[in-house]
Amino acid sequence: MPPKQQLSKAAKAAAALAGGKKSKKKWSKKSMKDRAQHAVILDQEKYDRILKEVPTYRYVSVSVLVDRLKIGGSLARIALRHLEKEGIIKPISKHSKQAIYTRAAASE
Protein backbone atom coordinates (compact mmCIF):
# COMPACT_ATOMS: atom_id res chain seq x y z
CA MET A 1 0.00 0.00 0.00
CA PRO A 2 1.54 3.32 -1.01
CA PRO A 3 2.02 5.97 1.69
CA LYS A 4 -0.59 8.70 2.05
CA GLN A 5 0.03 11.99 0.39
CA GLN A 6 0.86 14.81 2.83
CA LEU A 7 -1.34 17.87 2.35
CA SER A 8 -0.18 21.38 3.02
CA LYS A 9 -1.79 23.44 5.79
CA ALA A 10 -3.69 25.49 3.24
CA ALA A 11 -5.04 22.36 1.58
CA LYS A 12 -6.12 20.96 4.96
CA ALA A 13 -7.92 24.20 5.82
CA ALA A 14 -9.68 24.24 2.46
CA ALA A 15 -10.78 20.64 2.93
CA ALA A 16 -12.17 21.46 6.38
CA LEU A 17 -14.15 24.39 5.00
CA ALA A 18 -15.43 22.37 2.08
CA GLY A 19 -17.74 20.76 4.56
CA GLY A 20 -19.63 17.61 4.30
CA LYS A 21 -20.91 18.28 7.80
CA LYS A 22 -24.20 19.93 8.44
CA SER A 23 -24.06 23.28 10.18
CA LYS A 24 -25.67 23.42 13.61
CA LYS A 25 -29.20 24.70 13.82
CA LYS A 26 -29.47 28.22 15.13
CA TRP A 27 -32.30 28.47 17.59
CA SER A 28 -34.56 31.37 16.82
CA LYS A 29 -34.84 33.89 19.58
CA LYS A 30 -38.50 34.19 20.38
CA SER A 31 -39.82 37.16 22.23
CA MET A 32 -40.19 36.32 25.88
CA LYS A 33 -43.64 36.76 27.33
CA ASP A 34 -43.68 39.38 30.04
CA ARG A 35 -44.46 38.25 33.53
CA ALA A 36 -48.02 39.14 34.47
CA GLN A 37 -48.35 41.99 36.93
CA HIS A 38 -51.65 41.03 38.54
CA ALA A 39 -52.88 42.54 41.78
CA VAL A 40 -52.35 40.41 44.87
CA ILE A 41 -53.99 42.80 47.34
CA LEU A 42 -57.61 43.77 46.86
CA ASP A 43 -58.13 47.52 47.08
CA GLN A 44 -61.48 49.32 47.10
CA GLU A 45 -61.32 50.09 43.38
CA LYS A 46 -60.89 46.41 42.42
CA TYR A 47 -63.57 45.35 44.91
CA ASP A 48 -66.10 47.80 43.42
CA ARG A 49 -65.18 46.64 39.91
CA ILE A 50 -65.73 42.99 40.90
CA LEU A 51 -69.16 43.78 42.38
CA LYS A 52 -70.15 45.78 39.29
CA GLU A 53 -68.81 43.64 36.43
CA VAL A 54 -68.88 40.01 37.57
CA PRO A 55 -72.70 39.74 37.87
CA THR A 56 -72.93 40.63 34.16
CA TYR A 57 -70.71 37.71 33.08
CA ARG A 58 -72.53 34.64 31.81
CA TYR A 59 -69.59 32.34 32.57
CA VAL A 60 -67.57 33.07 35.71
CA SER A 61 -64.49 31.14 36.80
CA VAL A 62 -61.13 31.87 38.37
CA SER A 63 -59.43 32.10 34.99
CA VAL A 64 -62.05 34.55 33.67
CA LEU A 65 -61.50 36.88 36.63
CA VAL A 66 -57.73 36.65 36.31
CA ASP A 67 -57.86 37.51 32.59
CA ARG A 68 -60.43 40.29 32.69
CA LEU A 69 -59.75 41.96 36.03
CA LYS A 70 -55.97 41.40 36.23
CA ILE A 71 -56.06 39.95 39.73
CA GLY A 72 -54.20 36.95 41.12
CA GLY A 73 -55.72 33.47 41.27
CA SER A 74 -56.00 33.41 45.05
CA LEU A 75 -57.86 36.74 45.02
CA ALA A 76 -60.17 35.44 42.31
CA ARG A 77 -61.05 32.34 44.37
CA ILE A 78 -61.79 34.47 47.44
CA ALA A 79 -63.92 36.85 45.36
CA LEU A 80 -65.93 33.96 43.88
CA ARG A 81 -66.62 32.51 47.33
CA HIS A 82 -67.71 35.94 48.56
CA LEU A 83 -70.04 36.53 45.59
CA GLU A 84 -71.55 33.05 45.99
CA LYS A 85 -72.18 33.64 49.68
CA GLU A 86 -73.98 36.91 48.86
CA GLY A 87 -76.07 35.17 46.19
CA ILE A 88 -74.79 37.27 43.29
CA ILE A 89 -73.54 34.21 41.39
CA LYS A 90 -74.50 30.55 41.61
CA PRO A 91 -72.33 27.47 41.08
CA ILE A 92 -72.72 25.30 37.99
CA SER A 93 -69.88 22.88 38.67
CA LYS A 94 -67.64 22.74 41.69
CA HIS A 95 -64.52 20.68 41.29
CA SER A 96 -61.37 20.54 43.37
CA LYS A 97 -59.40 22.16 40.54
CA GLN A 98 -61.92 24.43 38.79
CA ALA A 99 -65.15 26.05 39.96
CA ILE A 100 -67.61 27.33 37.36
CA TYR A 101 -70.33 29.84 38.17
CA THR A 102 -73.00 31.81 36.35
CA ARG A 103 -74.97 34.90 37.23
CA ALA A 104 -77.80 34.21 39.65
CA ALA A 105 -80.43 36.18 37.73
CA ALA A 106 -79.90 34.19 34.52
CA SER A 107 -82.18 31.29 35.45
CA GLU A 108 -84.81 33.26 37.37
UniProtKB/Swiss-Prot annotation:
Residues 1-20 have a biased composition (Low complexity). Keywords: Cytoplasm, Methylation, Ribonucleoprotein, Ribosomal protein. GO terms for biological process: cytoplasmic translation. It is found in: Cytoplasm. GO terms for cellular component: cytosol; cytosolic small ribosomal subunit. GO terms for molecular function: structural constituent of ribosome. Belongs to the eukaryotic ribosomal protein eS25 family. Component of the ribosome, a large ribonucleoprotein complex responsible for the synthesis of proteins in the cell. The small ribosomal subunit (SSU) binds messenger RNAs (mRNAs) and translates the encoded message by selecting cognate aminoacyl-transfer RNA (tRNA) molecules. The large subunit (LSU) contains the ribosomal catalytic site termed the peptidyl transferase center (PTC), which catalyzes the formation of peptide bonds, thereby polymerizing the amino acids delivered by tRNAs into a polypeptide chain. This is Small ribosomal subunit protein eS25B. It comes from Saccharomyces cerevisiae (strain ATCC 204508 / S288c).
